[in-house]
Amino acid sequence: MKKLLCLTLVSSLLWSCVSPIPIHRFEEEIPKLVPDYTTLDQWIAHPLKFDNSDLLPKNLLEDTLCLDSIDVFFIHPTTYLKGDQWNADINNKKINRKTHNSTIKFQANVFCGLANIYAPVYRQIHIHGYKDNNNGLKAFDVAYKDIENAFKYYLNHFNNGNRIVIAAHSQGTNHAEKLFTDFLLENDSILQKVELAYLIGMPVHSLIKDYPACDDPLDRHCFLSWRTFSHGFYPSYKYSDKIAVTNPVNWRRNGAASLYNSHEGILFRNFKIKHPKSLSAVVHQGLLWVTFESFPMQKIFEKNDYHIADYNLFWLNIRQNFYERMKVKVEDEKTN
């Protein structure tokens, strides 16, 4: 079997206009090559090849957590920030390398040793697509179709009866939510195999029929979601109590702020886990607010929006909870 707490990168980059950007009508774009998921080249992470999802942080190499018969279908966030096309070329080596060295290495790898990790290459939309409700939505449909096709191929050729977890971030979460509403919720036999979903970095309402938000550290057949901001900060986009948030430190949806002592550490850009017990988190109006305890060079890392660090800030908490949450079924089966 087989994050990059890049807190020094200004998080607003994810939403800012970059040059070049697509300015033409979507219909004028030359159609991109459709991914062929029969080949490993179209999987940025796959159990049959070595990739960055197989790497543990440098100071966590003695980690002994292990599970089997679990698959994680991981949908990566936007890594297409510069370009003049609405959808990324699946053979763009620069974009694929960036995806591999960022989100696969610092997000998908949280499941290393605990699951088979499948992450498809797809014709992701340009970040500017989120600012264009016309062309962006059309480009989104192209990207989503790749995800749905990849998931169906995975089901038919790779799953082999394993338990399924869907994990995503940012643009990936938008596609994952649509995968639920358009496909999974229409196929009960498949939905029953999806034991957990990480819908991170985008607002997700608590209204996914038959698949609720998790509200307990050991809940399964539910989804986890959060968007991380500095305590007291309100973004200009969506926030409300109707948006589902699970605190990734105490794994509760509501209640008091998590204890500093419960925080296991942050995954930094140098690929090391550092500064355990350094933050407290609390759910507030559809947001996850964090407060940092003092640690060396803390001021350098302080931002209002921690979007790109949604996994990194809680990397070890996510990993340990995933193990505890998913081993429950194994223990139940041994008891029966």
Indicate residue ranges for each PLM-predicted region.
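Bacterial Sec-dependent N-terminal signal peptides
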Residues: 1-22
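Flexible, membrane-associating and regulatory peripheral segments of lipid-active enzymes
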Residues: 17-100, 104
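Surface cap/lid and interfacial helix-loop subdomains adjacent to catalytic sites
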Residues: 18-19, 148-160, 184-328, 332-336
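Active-site catalytic motif of lipid deacylating hydrolases and related acyltransferases
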Residues: 22-28, 75-161, 295-309, 316, ...
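Loop/turn elements at helix/coil->beta-strand transitions in domains of secreted/extracellular proteins
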Residues: 68-70, 113-117, 160-163, 192-195
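Structural recognition of the beta-strand scaffold that forms the well-ordered cores
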Residues: 71-75, 118-121, 165-166, 196-199, ...
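Gly/Ala-rich beta-loop-alpha elbow adjacent to hydrolase catalytic centers
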Residues: 168-172, 176
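Short glycine-enriched nucleophile-adjacent loop
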Residues: 175-184
